[in-house]
Every structure is written in C-alpha cells, then in structure tokens.
Amino acid sequence: MIKLCREVWIEVNLDAVKKNLRAIRRHIPHKSKIMAVVKANGYGHGSIEVARHALEHGASELAVASVEEGIVLRKAGITAPILVLGFTSLSCVKKSAAWNITLSAFQVDWMKEANEILEKEASANRLAIHINVDTGMGRLGVRTKEELLEVVKALKASKFLRWTGIFTHFSTADEPDTTLTKLQHEKFISFLSFLKKQGIELPTVHMCNTAAAIAFPEFSADMIRLGIGLYGLYPSAYIKQLNLVKLEPALSLKARIAYVKTMRTEPRTVSYGATYIAEPNEVIATLPIGYADGYSRALSNRGFVLHRGKRVPVAGRVTMDMIMVSLGENGEGKQGDEVVIYGKQKGAEISVDEVAEMLNTINYEVVSTLSRRIPRFYIRDGEIFKVSTPVLYV
C-alpha cells in the first residue's frame, strides 16, 4: 500500500471509463468515431492516463483546450490526433505544427498569418486545422456562409495548412427544450450543403457533445466529442432522466482522518470565524483537504463526508488545506480512518452531482477544479496499477 505524506487522494476507475466509452459506442451510429475530450487535466481525472485508456478502448482522437495541454500528451508518447478546441494565438503556430497538434480556427487573417509564419520557418509539418462554425454558441467561429467560404478558400490555398475537420458546438443540447439544438443542427447542415454546392469536399464533420450524442445520436456525423460522459457524469439531470445510456462515475475523492478530539473544554469553537460551536463531548475530526485542493469554501457548515458508511457534516469553515467534520457527541472515530468525500462507502454515497447542486453549479466544475496536488490512484481490472502525484510518497 502506498503511504502518502498528506493522506488525501483521488481514485480514478479506468474500468468505468471503458464502460462509459462502450455504452456511448453502442448508442451512436457505428460509422461515427469518438473523440475523447481530456481538457482541464481530463476534467480533473488526469489527462494522460484517461487519454491512453480511452484510445485503447474505442476513442480514435483526443481534444484539449490549449496547445500546452496537447504537448503534455505528446510528451507522454501519445500519437493520436489531438485537437485544440479553444482559440490559439499565432505565437503558438510553429509549436503546434512541430508537435503535430491540430488547431481550431475561423478567421481568414489568422490563416494567412499562420501560413506565413510556417513558410518563414520552412516548417517540415503542415498544420492541421478544424474550422469552427458558430451556429448559436456565440463563443468562437464563423457566422455566415460567405465568411465560411472565404475561410475555406484561404485554408485550401495555403501550402502549410491542411484542412482536416469542420465542427460546431450545441449550446442547449442538455436541456428539455430542443428548439435551439435543432435550429443549430439545421444551420450547420445548411452550411455544409452550401460548401458541397461549391464543389468543396468536406473533411471530418463533428457537432455532438455528450448531451447531443445521447439525446440526438442521429446528429453524430463522422465523429462525436465525448467529454463529461467519458467520466461517467451526465451533462444534466434531464439527460440522465432520458435513461438512454447508463454511465458509471469514474472518480472518488478520499482522505484519512488526521486528528480526532473530543471538545470537552471551552472554547469549543471550530475553524476561522468561530462559525461552529461544538457541543460538550462532541467529537471533531480533521481531514487534510481544503479549498486549495478544490473542495469549495462554499461547503463550509454545509457539506458532508462519509465516515464508516454514515454522513457526517463539515464543521466550521473550509480552510485552505484542511476541513473539520463532526462525528457527533461521543462519536467514534480514530486517526487513519478512511473518509469518502465524493463517492461511495458501505452503501452510502455522496455524488458529485449532489455536491454541484449544493454549490449551485454543475458537475463539470466540481471535478475539473480538483487540484493537481492531490495524488491520483488509477484503477484497472479492479487493482491500483499507477499513482500520479507531485507529492513524494514512500
């Protein structure tokens, strides 16, 4: 057993990742490929190991948010196509080509300048480009057919750029009202038809995120982008209630009790601000996790953890590196007891979705903000096979 200096860790069940991939694979058309989205350190799960496992079990391409995230994967020996979904400045064009990382782009001037940069550098690699079409997200992308045609012409005229994909992004595919999703789909298809009428052969076409892939598998086109669903989390309660695909959460967050005390003497205040006052003989346990680890300060006096299969409340304010929980009056607990912060223990569960609802946010934020300083234990075939951590362990 690995002994951590600071006993808090994340368990990532790669068997669950495999199940989720296969569940989506069965749900979408056979011809549609799967792009595994591993941005934000794999939504907090760890991008390298999730990417490797996804590629082993059905994904053919990867997506990230930045060139830097892509380079991390390349340095780990991953050779599959990697698409940067976000905007990339021209200063990173040369680097992207050198590392064979595909960029999303949508501006004629950007295309021309990128080509000039690579021409001056006599780049040995042509830079792959996916054109981003804005059909209703209002974030990035071309917005008119005429604009799209000019971008395509600039791209096809370039000697150092190559066109390998075109995509859009649905903004409300996770909601019960499907009006905008269908409108976006119609608009995107009309853009593609417009290009075809110009005699332009289309590269890989993709539009579905997890929500759209589940709710509208007929929109899957050449490829879908599987993000939150890869990790066993649903994009929304609505998508989960459709009961079309069964997903299994891959992440658990755990810790061991660092210290236990019975609050027999005054003052019985707990944590900053003295917002919690313990009862006589109340047992308070300290856990080595705080808001610097991604456990939100908004859970102060509100959150719960699992101890010996029972829910126990957070006592007082969440601090940067530690929280305190109440084991109750004359409660039982000892240093070294395992506590589950997100996940299951003896039939009880605190789900990421529950925590997200408590915080008035979404599950994406809860997992993606988990700090890199927390060790990740990767589980495969029911056993821990790798530990990824910046913290020394013996």
UniProtKB/Swiss-Prot annotation:
PROSITE patterns: ALANINE_RACEMASE. Its cofactor is pyridoxal 5'-phosphate. One of its GO terms (molecular function) is pyridoxal phosphate binding. The modification N6-(pyridoxal phosphate)lysine is found at K39. SMART domains: Ala_racemase_C (SM01005). The active site is at K39, Y272. The keyword Membrane does not apply. It comes from the Bacteria. Its EC number is 5.1.1.1. Substrate binds at R139, M320. Keywords: Isomerase, Pyridoxal phosphate. GO terms for cellular component: cytosol. Pathway: Amino-acid biosynthesis; D-alanine biosynthesis; D-alanine from L-alanine: step 1/1. HAMAP family: Ala_racemase. Catalyzes the interconversion of L-alanine and D-alanine. May also act on other amino acids. Belongs to the alanine racemase family. This is Alanine racemase 2. It comes from Bacillus subtilis (strain 168). The lineage of its organism: Bacteria, Bacillati, Bacillota, Bacilli, Bacillales. The gene is alr2.
